[in-house]
């Protein structure tokens, strides 16, 4: 299956969750109608797809916020929106540590659960074996105000959630 075919599968089965712009997935932007620019290629509200798929079934796992195709439709993209600006501005005042916030964000868990949901919907357990995949993290950091410091803090926080391919493979192979 190609990235475009996977995207089309979601558009056909969950068309009501197609949004014309990524900010249509963000609650704050949607409520305040901040985004009036329509993208050339819409995204799919993956939280909506997940909620629909698991409705009345069982506990709903975490998921990424949206999916789309990118890179001239060569890549299937998982998109996560994170509001880091407020967190970074008040980091000294907050009682939660960076680690607690990272655990709350659970980026690797969301990506894993989202991939599993794609496999369930398509019925293909080997879906991502050869499918070009991209994880996109969209933030609200202003590039005009201390962009390097903000970016550094964000990368340090993300690095703590990352795993090496080796440890990921070892953990997955133990499950078999």
Features from the language model and the residues they span:
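Catalytic cores of nucleic-acid endonucleases
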Residues: 84-143
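Conserved catalytic cores of phosphodiester-cleaving nucleases, focusing on short active-site segments
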Residues: 66-68, 75-86, 114
């Amino acid at each position: 299956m190609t990235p475009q075919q996977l995207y089309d599968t979601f558009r056909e089965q969950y068309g009501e969750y197609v949004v014309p712009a990524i900010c249509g997935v963000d609650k704050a932007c949607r409520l305040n109608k901040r985004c009036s620019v329509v993208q050339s290629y819409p995204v799919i509200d993956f939280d909506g797809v997940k909620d629909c798929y698991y409705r009345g079934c069982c506990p709903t796992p975490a998921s990424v916020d949206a999916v789309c195709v990118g890179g001239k439709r060569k890549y299937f993209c998982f998109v996560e929106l994170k509001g880091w600006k407020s967190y970074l501005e008040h980091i000294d005042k907050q009682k939660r540590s960076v680690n607690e916030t990272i655990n709350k964000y659970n980026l690797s868990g969301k990506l894993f659960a989202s991939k599993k949901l794609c496999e369930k919907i398509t019925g293909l357990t080997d879906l991502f074996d050869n499918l070009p995949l991209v994880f996109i993290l969209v933030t609200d950091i202003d590039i005009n105000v201390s962009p390097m410091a903000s970016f550094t803090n964000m990368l340090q926080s993300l690095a703590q959630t990352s795993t090496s391919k080796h440890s990921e493979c070892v953990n997955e192979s133990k499950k078999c």
